Amino acid sequence: MVKNEDGTYARGYKLATLRTLLDSAGLLSQVAMSAIQVHDVALCRPLLERAPVLRAGDLLLEDRGFIDGATLSHLKRKRRVDVIMPLKANMLATQEAIQLAAMADKWEAHPSRAHQRMALVCGVEHMWSECEVPLNACVIQFWNKKKKRTDHIVLVTTDRKLNASWIVRHYEERPEIEQDYEQMKSGGWQLQKLSSTRYSEVVFYVLTVVLSYSLYHLFANTPPGTRFADKTRQALAFEQLRTQRTHIIVYAGGYFEIFETLSFVQMVLQLSPPVQERLRTWLAEHLSQIQKRE
């Protein structure tokens, strides 16, 4: 349990995921879980250091909340995995990169935003004591409408072969990744909708959702599944309800029968009034019991 900024309390779990990007969306190829009070970096560090899904030559996109020089150095040195991540504004490496970009004054056009420009700055690792591997930076300059002044974003990478344009192009995949993650949490996969507090049941539910999510996106990246690539699970479920017939199962004694819903309703409407009344009474009692359990 943790205390929120507004004074309320929250209980739950934390889920860390490694996403392998495909042509459309991606697969959750590695996950880790912990109690909600565990820090994000503490949860993800073992995952990044040991996950078999990360292989030499891979490129990892990270959020600035995961800034950890030791982990970044381990990934590059021991695993030969490169990283792209934004630096915090108050870091010395950030200020160094901005000043060097201004001194060189060799700005390039941003690949996707007409009113922004960027510059490549090589060798900023000496201003970040926790980082033990060479770093290049991409300084993005833009007009901050809220602050009404020129502002900067600094992306760093351990892949020294990348130019400024490719650093930005790779990192611009992050907003789409975050949108997909929000869909997984609340969109239709209902990752946050837990019916039990038992850890074993929570783990089973989460792993089932993660596996289903990945299998869905794996299918969406095949030729037969391309028609589902740009649709959320919610949209597909709604479309299915609108266009496909539904069925119900009716039990009586030791027997059951599967009826198409409209056919079953038609059959019920053809029953004699006394039988319909008995059925109406039974349904009222049954629905009342269900509502009490919920």
Locate predicted features.
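Active-site-proximal, Lys/Arg-enriched surface segment
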Residues: 1-21
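Short amphipathic alpha-helical "interface-anchor" segments enriched in bulky aromatics
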Residues: 164-195
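Short gly/pro/ser/thr-enriched loop/turn and capping motifs at secondary-structure boundaries
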Residues: 89-95
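Active-site beta-loop-alpha junctions of metal-dependent nucleic acid enzymes
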Residues: 32-53
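A short, flexible helix-boundary coil/loop motif
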Residues: 96, 100-141, 186, 191-194, ...
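Short, well-ordered alpha-helical microsegments
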Residues: 40-41, 67-72, 164
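A short alpha/beta connector and helix-capping loop motif
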Residues: 69-88
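Short, conserved catalytic/metal-binding motifs centered on acidic residues
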Residues: 1, 20, 26, 44, ...
